Amino acid sequence: MPRRWRGARRLTRLFQDVIALFTFGCPLFTLELKLGQYFRKGPFHGFQHIHKRFWCVGFASVLMAAFMGIFYNTVMAWSLVYLCYSFADPLPWAEDPISFFYDGVLQSSPSIAEMSGIAWYVLLANVVSWLFVGFALSKGVLSSGKVAYVTATMPYVCIVALLVRGALLPGAGAGVRAYLRVDFAKLAEFDTWARAFNQIFFSLSVALGALVTFGSYRPKSEDYVRDGVLVPVINCATSFTAGFFVFAMLGYISEQKGVEIRELEFSGFALAFIT
């Protein structure tokens, strides 16, 4: 799902993302796949085979992957909390989704100086989420490969369902028009280019060690160049498609609130839960 929507210039950003994809994303994706495929090792020992002092590069990749795993598992815990709440009637977030997310689920404090208590149900959901991860990885690639059949296909089912639902909402057309609006002036701004490259690195999981690990399980005869181009392109196309239902939802919310899309006061991960 696209992470940035502020300013409603995604079509312009698509051009920047494509440039970033083919100049840095695909080459680095292919390089990491080949590194694991050639040495048959994970990131730590794979980089060490290049030079004995490069072990620190592999260690840094594993460390970053651990941090990312903690972050995503927290988001999964929030999703489990919402799943449990979805059985209530009426839905607890129907009236004020923003307050429900920040006050009801996160129980967030006004500032770091005023720490709130532990949200025990979120903690429990986090434990359950980690148990799911442990179960998926319990037998290595034998179990994770089977789980991937579900985790790799279900997002596309959800995207189609959300696209249909978003298209039927009032204000969806305005949201899609904002999504496809072009602002060529943004092409001259360094900040938008930096964000585009950041998005490509983040969405492809480059430099996190995962691609090296995946490559280590691939037969040496498999075409790594084909996969190094095809997978990133599909990833980018999926993100662009997902943007349609995101902006359809934003168009609906902006119409309900009577404000412009760019004036909505939420972004980032909260967007998925508030919309």
At which residue positions do the language-model features occur?
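Signal-peptide-cleavage-adjacent N-terminal segments of secreted and extracellular proteins
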Residues: 1-21, 49, 146, 165
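Juxtamembrane transmembrane-helix boundary signature
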Residues: 16-52, 73, 169
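Hydrophobic alpha-helical transmembrane segments of multi-pass membrane proteins
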Residues: 18-23, 60-71, 124-132, 194-205
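Early transmembrane alpha-helices of polytopic membrane proteins
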Residues: 52-85, 137, 153-164, 227-246
